[in-house]
């Protein structure tokens, strides 16, 4: 099963910001092709100061992190890096609504990648067989 690894460097966040993005009511998802040859997922979480104090920012990131770990392996594409950006409503919205937003955004990004990819073979969905073999 592919691991979900997190970004640590600012340059990684800036690189992903140049790719595709999808904005929903409660969050923004940015994605770009991964530079890594591993089939692991690389993910970043961001919450700016304009959404609230440290408690609100950390709560927003915790909620995003929880739902991403729950849904990314099922809906995400291999060789794609994701950055989830919290909005002011992320910490207070219904958990199921946030889950729907995350799934919608991931599917929308996947559609963009598959349509705009020059070589569709380099982006593969993680199949159940691949998950079980790892």
Where are these regions (language model features)?
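Positively charged, solvent-exposed patches that mediate nucleic-acid binding
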Residues: 1-134
